[in-house]
Amino acid sequence: FLQKGLIDYMMFDPIWLGGITECLKAGAIADAHQIPVSIHDCNGPVNFTVGVNLSMAMTNACTYETARGFYYGWYKELLEDVPLIDHGFVSPLKGDGLGVKLKDKWLEESNSNIVISNLK
């Protein structure tokens, strides 16, 4: 489809496509064909944050689609902070990695399963 010029925009969702690496690959393939990328989110605040960071890393990212009802609703119930949307523009979180930090109340739940990886 790309080689035949049948695609005007490529839109994908980080969770559905397979994660950060797969999204970067898809974005690079689209860029090689001068196709702009639009990232989609309707799967939660971590996916939203991943998409924001991907948008910052892709020179061909042009738009980001998310559900305002989720962003202003339950997304903020799960995380300490979500990337700020201001006048149609979004900024990535500051901090290590993606900058994501779950609210303590979710970590303290009796049925929470916490796994820490210390890869070096």
Protein language model regions, located:
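Shared catalytic-loop signature of beta/alpha-barrel
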Residues: 1-89, 93
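C-terminal extensions of enzymes
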Residues: 75-120
